[in-house]
Regions:
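Short, positionally conserved secondary-structure boundary motifs
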Residues: 1-77, 149-152
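Acidic/glycine-rich C-terminal interaction modules and beta/coil loop segments
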Residues: 32, 51-152
């Protein structure tokens, strides 16, 4: 809450305000040795809304703008993707941010624990899956926790 000064000589009034969480909006790119997250802006959201998304610390969450059509219809070009960058080891199927061959991208991961393998899958059927024989060697940069659809 914050105090609003009185203009009539009375006591200042308290006004309830939502606590805000600041999330970096980043542009991920494949670096020579490690991917780079260049901060291009910030998004303010209420702490209450943030806690609905995740119990993670705010500095573990990065937002980024989706590019391309490989994950349509789940993620469209221009959507805002929220990623928990503290999750580096996938333990379940889901959407993850990966680095592979100098590229950074979001894909669906399907783990096959029985065969100790995995598949990186685009939701758009025009893009074939990528088989991974050693999923523990994947360069996982984080797990997608939410997608904000941007309608244009």
């Amino acid at each position: 809450s914050r105090e609003i000064p009185s203009t009539d000589g009375k006591q200042p009034q308290k006004q309830a305000t939502a606590d805000l969480v600041k999330i970096d909006i980043v542009n991920p790119s494949g670096g020579e040795k490690e991917p780079v997250f260049q901060t291009v802006g910030q998004q303010l959201i209420s702490e209450d809304v943030f806690r609905v998304l995740t119990p993670a610390a705010p500095d573990s969450i990065k937002a980024m703008i989706a590019r391309g059509d490989a994950m349509q219809p789940t993620i469209s070009d221009g959507d805002l993707i929220w990623v928990d960058v503290s999750i580096k080891t996938p333990t379940s199927d889901g959407l993850y941010l990966f680095a592979l061959k100098g590229e950074v991208f979001v894909k669906r991961l399907r783990l096959d624990n029985f065969n100790h393998s995995a598949a990186i899958i685009s939701d758009n059927p025009l893009y074939p899956p990528i088989g991974i024989s050693k999923p523990d060697k994947l360069s996982t940069l984080g797990k997608v926790i939410s997608v904000t659809k941007i309608y244009r």
